[in-house]
Curated annotation (Swiss-Prot):
It is an enzyme of class 2 (transferase). InterPro entries: CitG, TriPribosyl-deP-CoA_syn_CitG. HAMAP family: CitG. GO terms for molecular function: ATP binding; triphosphoribosyl-dephospho-CoA synthase activity. GO terms for biological process: prosthetic group biosynthetic process. Keywords: ATP-binding, Nucleotide-binding, Transferase. This is Probable 2-(5''-triphosphoribosyl)-3'-dephosphocoenzyme-A synthase 2. The gene is citG2. Its EC number is 2.4.2.52.
Length: 298
């Protein structure tokens, strides 16, 4: 796991340098998630999970490519403070598409971090806006600002009846899943109300940081209506994965290295069922990133 930077900046540093510090934390969040092992159905240091088209090195290259775009999201967020927040998203889309193109170039066409570009792009734009407005930059204010950016997004994009439905529209109409859009529009409640307090509490208890993150991933998997899982396994696959994660948590979760045997077994089951909780992995990245925000003095 990447080390958490200690006291990365101070109040006298210039905005552009601050943006680089926040971008570095977001980059570390992506690396921390993919290096975390073992993760059920996901790419990690041990295997490629339920994926045949991507490997650990793809995620490392992708994170590096995305890293250089993150300050631009902050700059845009800072530049449009006179706009109502719900008007910001339209200007973020071209940045997001350009960042995606950089990701695809780095991975030779493999979609490693599209969900993280969406979530981290929103949060980085929120950082820029709040910094420019001299408002507090904290997990709660960032998620609330991201929610303001996404106001009406689910209705606009998922309730459309196109002749050719996107995967997200199909899952919304069939199963009522809103995916990354719904979580963002709601202000990341799975992170703010569940994952982040859980992770912080485990660290406060002295839990090993990697074990705490793995336990937090299980919590997210048990609660999240993960469209990545549903697109592969349908409602039954999603229900099975949520139940398996919940059972592990009820049995005590991941407290010691001895408990990793349960994750190895869960991983093999996910691989056999071709299930990958990529949406929960994206939310774990958000959780770790927000947990580090307080380290940056601004």
């Amino acid at each position: 796991m990447m080390p958490i930077p200690a006291n990365p900046t101070n109040a006298s540093i210039q905005p552009q340098s601050l943006y680089d510090v926040w971008a570095d934390l977001a980059w570390r969040a992506m690396l921390t998630e993919v290096n975390l092992s073992p993760k059920p159905g996901l790419v990690d240091r041990l295997n490629c999970g339920a994926h045949k088209d991507m490997a650990l090195a793809d995620f490392h290259r992708s994170a590096e490519a995305i890293r250089h775009w993150l300050p631009r999201f902050m700059e845009y967020g800072a530049s449009c403070t006179r706009l109502p927040p719900e008007s910001v998203l339209a200007g973020l889309r071209p940045l997001g598409m350009a960042c995606e193109a950089a990701m695809f170039r780095a991975t030779a066409g493999v979609n490693t971090h599209k969900g993280s570009i969406f979530s981290l792009g929103l949060l980085c734009a929120a950082i820029g806006r709040l910094y420019q407005l001299r408002q507090p930059i904290a997990a709660e204010t960032l998620c609330a600002t991201a929610a303001d950016f996404c106001r009406g997004l689910t209705t606009r994009e998922l309730r459309q009846n196109n002749l050719q439905l996107t995967a997200g529209q199909r899952l919304y109409q069939q199963l009522g899943l809103t995916g990354a859009r719904g979580e963002a529009e709601a202000g990341y409640p799975l992170v703010i109300r569940h994952a982040l307090p859980h992770y912080r509490a485990l660290l406060a208890q002295g839990r090993d940081p990697e074990l705490a993150l793995l336990d937090t991933l299980l919590l997210l998997m048990s609660l999240n209506g993960d469209t990545n899982v549903a697109s592969r396994g349908g409602a039954d696959g999603l229900r099975w994965l949520q139940q398996q994660a919940a059972v592990l948590l009820q049995q005590g979760g991941i407290r010691t290295p001895d408990d990793l045997v349960y994750l190895h077994r869960f991983d093999q089951q996910c691989i056999e069922r071709n299930l990958s909780p990529g949406g929960s992995a994206d939310l774990l990245i958000v959780t770790w990133f927000l947990a580090q925000i307080s380290q940056v003095n601004h």
